[in-house]
Amino acid sequence: MINNTDNEYLEQKLSELSKKVPASIISKLRESITNSPIEITRDEIDKIIEIVMKDYLSSLVHPGEAIGVVAAQSIGEPGTQMTLRTFHFAGVRELNVTLGLPRLIEIVDARKVPSTPMMTIYLNEEYAKDRDMALEVARRIEYTRVEHVVETVNLDVGGMGIILKLDPVLLKDKGLSTEDVEKVIKKLKMGDYRVENSDEYTIAIYFENMETVTGLFKAREKILSTKIKGVKGIKRAIIRKKGDEYVIITDGSNLEGVLGVKGVDVSRIETNNLHEVESVLGVEAARELITREIKRVLEEQGLDVDIRHIELVSDIMTRTGEVRQIGRHGVTGEKTSVLARAAFEVTVKHLLDAAARGDMEEFKGVVENIIIGQPIKLGTGMVELLMRPANR
């Protein structure tokens, strides 16, 4: 909390600081000082800025520091203590979630689809407080086909018909009725057919011009795979209480599809699918997700890694404007050095391809200089010294 004249003074000091410190730090500093519960004087503003500046300068990497090696060691060494299994999601019997080393490998490999895709969907205020309304949204999201609510399927070969016996428990669980199922079946294009109800949970479909049993089998598959409702890719949607609100946890992920569902808070949807985030929200959002997912995986195992090492990994993976894996098909495979590529994987192939193309090795990086025993251009090796002969 500061008065108006001190506020002008603060803005002046922050504008001077902006030439030396990133905008994000200045923004947090401004917010902390203006929202402080106690009044801050000019002298205290100067002292705060001095401490922030000192901390910032002491946190900078020294010129010539091998930051790649330090980051690799800082993430890789704790990785040896991580678990190798897929666990049940906490408190939810039906869902599994990949944790530990397999999940870390998935992230840095930038896999197109994670082994256990999941979403955490937060709801708008009126839906988040009421369990029944949250359940209604979950039912709208969960992808449901006819086969998901059918108990038995019988073929009437003589009358060329298909008789579906619906499961009342499953219908109630999915929030559906027999009429809903009947409605989607009537919309199907399968030639001339009529739909009959012998009782509340039975639907019979009879075909007028069906000539073969094979055609009947094909019609059965088409009916069973017909979508009733939901978002494609969401196999299961479960409600959990988180703090004082209800959230939806899903088995499966479809960020674009869920954004259009009524009741969903679009500003707080979370998914563990990197490529979905990249295609829907852009590469900056994907970069943020890589950082957050790696940090979460490490913290779940009780491992504390400095965020800067993790951010270096996410920066390298997204620096070209798209998410690329750290491997021979991504970051490492695009190195200009022949020896660096050969040292990583498939050595002979890289050497033969480079020889056929007539590539030139310039020995600018670390790996290639170590291979031939030259001093590397890091640390004291960055500097080229010239000696001035002494005057005799």
UniProtKB/Swiss-Prot annotation:
Give an example GO cellular component term for this record.
cytoplasm
Biological process (GO) annotations held by this record are: DNA-templated transcription
Q: Which InterPro entries match?
A: DNA-dir_RpoC_beta_prime (IPR045867), RNA_pol_Rpb1_5 (IPR007081), RPO1C (IPR012757)
Q: Where in the cell is it found?
A: Cytoplasm
Keywords recorded for this protein, A-Z: Cytoplasm, DNA-binding, DNA-directed RNA polymerase, Nucleotidyltransferase, Transcription, Transferase
Claim: Manganese is one of the keywords in the record: no
Q: What is its EC number?
A: 2.7.7.6
Q: Which domain of life is it from?
A: Archaea
Could you tell me what this protein does? DNA-dependent RNA polymerase (RNAP) catalyzes the transcription of DNA into RNA using the four ribonucleoside triphosphates as substrates. Forms part of the jaw domain.
Instruction: List the PANTHER family hit by this protein, alphabetically.
Output: DNA-DIRECTED RNA POLYMERASE (PTHR19376), DNA-DIRECTED RNA POLYMERASE III SUBUNIT RPC1 (PTHR19376:SF32)
- Protein name as it appears in the record: DNA-directed RNA polymerase subunit Rpo1C
Q: Which organism is it from?
A: Metallosphaera sedula (strain ATCC 51363 / DSM 5348 / JCM 9185 / NBRC 15509 / TH2)
Lineage summary: Archaea, Thermoproteota, Thermoprotei, Sulfolobales, Sulfolobaceae
Give the gene name. Answer: rpo1C
